[in-house]
Structure formats: structure tokens, C-alpha cells
């Protein structure tokens, strides 16, 4: 259940709400509203601070009850950490900490006043839209496949978060991005027996059909065969769940050239003949998170009605294994006409993407971005904090990096030097689909670059940033924030 958001300018000590959220720094300095409530309550917050109950350390919080002079029955005091280090990341964490602290409290409506805090190089509108994104992310609960009683328990709690401020533009953008992120997370978290290629196609088609200005075209196997998508169809051969190519369009920019996003949509990746093993295969439902992210970005763009043209392409495929599955040493012909020698069937993402990228050329993109959980090598290099970015275009790299920094959905650029290209040489085809042990994220990007010649193109490898690790890990919805901000910056 998504949070509901509103702006509120009522005096915090008299506002009607279940809880007012304030902050305290590690040096015991109170946020402006905390100072106001402290004065109204006769110094109660200061007294608790002096007693050591409120430390101000990041990650800590305390729920205070029935302060004298304060109408709200509860005040949540959130630790902000060191004041001189309080930046975008610390602000986002504090908002998330506040929402998580209220998870089990009998609070359905709260007023967040952390939006009043000064954040370096940010303004009031940013504070509000980032608070919306962070709060919605923290409040997210997966319930799609839970039983009735557990689903009811998970859906209880905070319903409405009022944010202190008046920047309506920040609220509108924040809600759009939050909805796009949540849409992507919901798709990514579904089990693969539900989120099949057909389900992904049906879900996105329904969204487009219910939002004026958006359209959706679904290409089936026969359409792809007619187009010569031999690489994509080779990956799909081993699965009973047939492939679909999803093409979403938002026409908000008249006759202008469109921005095109392509997202890897492997709804489950067994590895194929090069079968994955336990310790990795159980998380392969997340291999469609690139597709989910570009769909989520489309949702955000439609919700905020961006004045540009946007096309989203998702090759939705399951990489499974049967007697008809493609094999190592097969040579397949891509839509571009280039032949590809298969060195490993678990390097399937680049095969479905190369045909989707070739298909994208027909739209004459202003810029072409692909998003994929493409390589474990990228996760080894960058961990889960940063998305890997590769492009030959410095201006495009700077645009994407700047957008990511602005919304704290950050990326890090990796090289696409010519010296890596010869690692993809093949004796039997135009290109080999793997590049050896070293620089795997880069050679995967180099492979895709061979199918984007002449395009203003960038590749985002989200293998690390798309999901959290472990039994309780979930899809993150990244990089919906980065991509949406990048599109907003183009308007």
C-alpha cells in the first residue's frame, strides 16, 4: 500500500495529527520545529537530551508521548548525525528512519518537519520531493503473495504523511518518482511463476490503456521472427513461456525526436545450458529489474506528464533449459545482421538487448539508454551503492551522472576503450558473446556498443543496485529516480 502525501503549513505544536516528526543532531542541536516543541513543552526535549535519552546519532529515534503544550499525542525525535556532515544522503536516511520507526506504532497520520532542514546544495522543492521518495521507499511492504492475515498485518500502519512546506512542484515530482519506483519494485519482487513475459506484457499494456497519451504495442514471436531477431529468439527457445517485445510510447513532445529506454526483461534466468547453481539462481527473478526500471520510469513520466516523447522497449524473455535450448558454440544471427558465437548461455542479457537496441534505431532517438542487470562483474567492482555507467559520449555521461547525484540514485562511469574490444573477437562469427574473465562489465558494454553505432547511447549496469542481497532482500526500483530526473532535466 503506497503512502498518501500532502503538504501542511499548520503550526506544528497545534497541528492535528497522530505524530510530529522532528530531528536532533549529534551535537544535541535541535531542528527548528524540535526547538519550538521543546519551548512549548517547558524544555521536555532538552531535558531528555541532557539525560542521554536522545543522542542525535544517525539511525536512532525516540517516540515521546503527551508533551505539554503540544496537540499531537506523539513526537518522534530522529537522530540526524553530525551537523557538518549532513547532506543529501543523511537527509534521505533520516526520512527513511522516521518512517521505519513508526512501522509498529498506532500512527496512521504523521507530520514530517525534517523538510525544513538545510541540505547542502539543495532547495526546498528538493527537500520535499526527496522526502516523498524516501518515505514511500521506507514504507513499502511486499504483500502480493502473502496470505490474508499476514497481508492485513503488513498493510496496517502509516497511511498519510503530511510534509511541512509549500513547494507543490516538489510534491508533484516526488509523488511521480515514488510511484514509478514502487511500480518497478512491485514487478521485480513478484515470483517468476507469476511475472512471466506474458504477465509483464499484459500489465504494461493495461497501464497504457488506462492513461491518456500513453500507448503500448506488444510484438509476439512471429513478429520478432519477421524482424530477424535471432539473438533474442535463441535465448527464448528453451522456455515454455514465450517471449514478448513490449513497446511503450508517451507522446508529450509533439514532433520532437524521442528519448528511448531499453530494459532487460529476463523474467527468470536459469543460465541455460551453462546452468546457475544455488547461491545465485534463487535471486534470478530480479533479472528483469532493468525492464521493470524503464517501465517504472515510463510510469513516472506519464504521471508528471513530461513534455517530451518517450519510448520504452522491454524484451521480455525467460532463459530456461529444455532439449531445444541454445548451446555454447552456437552461432546466431542478430537483427542487425551481425553473427554472434555463443560462448556462454548465461550471458543471455546482451543477446536480447542487442536485438532490442537494433529495433530502437527505427525511432531515431535523441538519446538511447539501456538498463540491465547485466554482469556480476559490475557488482564486484562497484558493490550495491553505484550503478555502472558506460558510454562513448562525455556529455551524455555527465547528464546521467548529474541526474543521479541530484536524486541520490548514483552511478559511476567505467571505460569503453577500444583495447577491450578485441576480447570479443571470434573465429566463427562477427562477435563472441563473452570477453573472458577480466573486465566483464566493460566487455559486456563493449558488446552492446557494437549494436549502437551512430547512436547517442549509454549503458547502465544495475546488477548491484537493482536489488538487496539475502533472504530478506527486495528489488530497489533503481534507477527510476536517476532516469526520471534525467528526463526532467531534458524538458
Curated annotation (Swiss-Prot):
Comment on bound cofactor: Binds 2 manganese ions per subunit.
Predominant cellular place of this UniProt entry's protein: cytoplasm
Enzyme class: hydrolase
Subcellular location: Cytoplasm
Entry's Gene Ontology BP terms: proteolysis
Binding site for Mn(2+) 1: 269, 346, 348
NCBIfam families membership: PRK00913.1-4
The protein's name in its UniProt record: Probable cytosol aminopeptidase
Organism: Xylella fastidiosa (strain M12)
Amino acid at each position: 500500500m503506497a503512502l498518501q502525501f500532502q503538504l501542511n503549513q499548520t503550526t506544528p505544536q497545534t497541528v492535528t495529527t497522530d505524530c510530529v516528526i522532528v530531528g536532533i543532531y549529534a551535537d544535541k542541536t535541535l531542528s527548528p520545529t524540535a526547538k519550538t516543541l521543546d519551548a512549548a513543552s517547558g524544555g521536555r526535549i532538552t531535558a531528555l537530551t541532557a539525560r542521554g535519552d536522545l543522542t542525535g546519532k544517525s539511525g536512532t529515534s525516540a517516540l515521546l508521548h503527551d508533551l505539554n503544550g503540544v496537540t499531537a499525542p506523539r513526537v518522534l525525535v530522529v537522530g540526524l548525525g553530525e551537523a557538518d556532515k549532513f547532506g543529501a544522503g543523511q537527509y534521505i536516511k533520516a526520512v527513511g528512519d522516521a518512517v521505519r520507526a513508526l512501522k509498529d506504532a498506532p500512527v496512521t497520520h504523521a507530520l514530517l518537519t525534517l523538510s525544513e532542514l538545510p541540505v547542502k546544495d539543495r532547495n526546498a522543492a528538493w527537500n520535499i520531493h526527496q522526502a516523498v521518495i524516501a518515505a514511500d521507499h521506507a514504507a513499502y511492504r511486499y504483500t502480493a503473495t502473502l496470505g490474508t492475515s499476514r497481508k492485513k498485518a503488513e498493510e496496517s500502519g502509516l497511511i498519510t504523511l503530511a510534509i511541512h512546506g509549500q513547494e507543490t512542484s516538489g510534491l508533484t515530482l516526488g509523488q511521480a518518482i515514488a510511484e514509478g519506483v514502487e511500480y518497478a519494485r512491485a514487478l521485480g519482487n513478484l515470483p517468476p511463476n507469476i511475472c512471466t513475459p506474458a504477465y509483464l506484457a499484459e500489465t504494461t499494456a493495461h497501464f497504457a490503456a488506462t492513461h491518456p497519451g500513453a500507448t503500448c504495442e506488444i510484438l509476439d514471436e512471429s513478429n520478432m521472427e519477421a524482424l530477424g531477431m535471432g539473438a533474442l529468439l535463441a535465448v527464448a527457445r528453451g522456455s515454455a513461456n514465450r517471449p514478448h517485445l513490449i513497446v511503450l510510447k508517451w507522446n508529450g513532445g509533439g514532433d520532437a525526436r524521442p528519448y528511448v529506454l531499453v530494459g532487460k526483461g529476463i523474467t527468470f534466468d536459469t543460465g541455460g545450458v551453462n546452468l546457475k547453481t544455488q547461491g545465485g539462481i534463487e535471486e534470478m527473478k530480479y533479472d528483469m529489474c532493468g525492464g521493470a526500471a524503464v517501465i517504472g520510469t515510463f510510469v513516472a513520466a506519464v504521471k508528471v506528464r513530461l513534455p517530451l516523447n518517450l519510448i520504452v522497449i522491454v524484451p521480455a524473455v525467460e532463459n530456461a533449459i529444455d532439449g531445444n535450448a541454445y548451446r555454447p558454440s552456437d552461432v546466431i544471427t542478430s537483427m542487425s545482421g551481425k553473427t554472434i558465437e555463443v560462448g556462454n548461455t548465461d550471458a543471455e542479457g546482451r543477446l536480447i538487448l542487442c536485438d532490442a537496441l537494433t529495433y530502437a534505431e527505427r525511432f531515431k532517438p535523441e538519446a538511447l539508454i539501456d538498463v540491465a542487470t547485466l554482469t556480476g562483474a559490475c557488482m564486484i567492482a562497484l558493490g550495491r551503492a553505484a550503478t555502472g555507467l558506460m558510454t562513448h559520449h562525455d556529455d551524455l555521461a555527465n547528464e546521467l551522472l548529474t541526474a543521479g547525484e541530484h536524486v541520490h540514485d548514483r552511478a559511476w562511469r567505467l571505460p569503453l576503450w577500444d583495447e577491450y574490444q578485441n576480447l570479443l573477437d571470434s573465429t566463427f562469427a562477427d562477435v563472441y558473446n563473452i570477453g573472458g574473465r577480466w573486465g566483464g562489465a566493460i566487455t559486456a558494454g563493449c558488446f552492446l556498443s557494437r549494436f549502437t553505432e551512430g547512436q547517442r547511447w549509454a549503458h547502465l549496469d544495475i546488477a548491484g543496485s537493482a536489488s538487496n542481497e539475502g533472504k530478506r532482500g527486495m528489488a530497489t526500483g533503481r534507477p527510476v529516480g536517476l532516469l526520471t530526473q534525467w528526463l526532467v532535466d531534458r524538458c
